[in-house]
């Protein structure tokens, strides 16, 4: 018997946080899941929309212009406890680019205006207004064995802390 499994991906702030076509991350996942006969549903939610983390197997938040990130950050705070609980229970989140700023304690713009973060990680984000482009080599903290990862950075923000 051929059983088809379903994965529900919750894409938060798809209309605001999709800089550089990061939508491609989800298309790649959809393609690979499809090859394994797993249906990959994408549920899009944005500012003012209610969402249920319980129905999502996977949550994606991409990068965006800083003003869009600020708007999304004000909205996502209403789910602060739900997001913390979901992460602590093992829910999978893929947060790319400057969207990671929302998961720290706070972040600030170039004028030093402070925005509250979700407080998942103990860091503070800063928007510099200057573009930094470079290659990066990293060793993910979640790997029990050294796992060398290569990437590319194109950013205007940075974090301080862990």
Each language-model region and where it sits:
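Short, acidic Gly/Pro/Ser/Thr-rich loop/turn segments
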Residues: 16-19, 66-68, 125-128, 158-161
């Amino acid at each position: 018997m051929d059983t088809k499994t379903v994965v529900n991906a919750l894409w938060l702030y798809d209309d605001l946080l999709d800089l550089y076509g990061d939508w491609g991350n989800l298309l790649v996942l959809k393609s690979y899941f499809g090859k394994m006969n797993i249906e990959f549903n994408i549920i899009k939610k944005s500012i003012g929309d209610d969402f249920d983390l319980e129905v999502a197997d996977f949550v994606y938040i991409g990068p965006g212009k800083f003003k869009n990130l600020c708007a999304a950050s004000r909205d996502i705070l209403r789910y602060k406890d739900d997001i913390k609980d979901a992460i602590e229970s093992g829910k999978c989140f893929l947060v790319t680019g400057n969207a990671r700023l929302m998961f720290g304690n706070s972040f600030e713009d170039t004028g030093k205006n402070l925005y509250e973060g979700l407080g998942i990680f103990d860091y503070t984000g800063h928007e510099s207004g200057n573009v930094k482009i470079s290659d990066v080599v990293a060793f993910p903290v979640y790997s029990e064995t050294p796992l060398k990862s290569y990437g590319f950075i194109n950013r205007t923000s940075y974090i301080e802390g862990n």
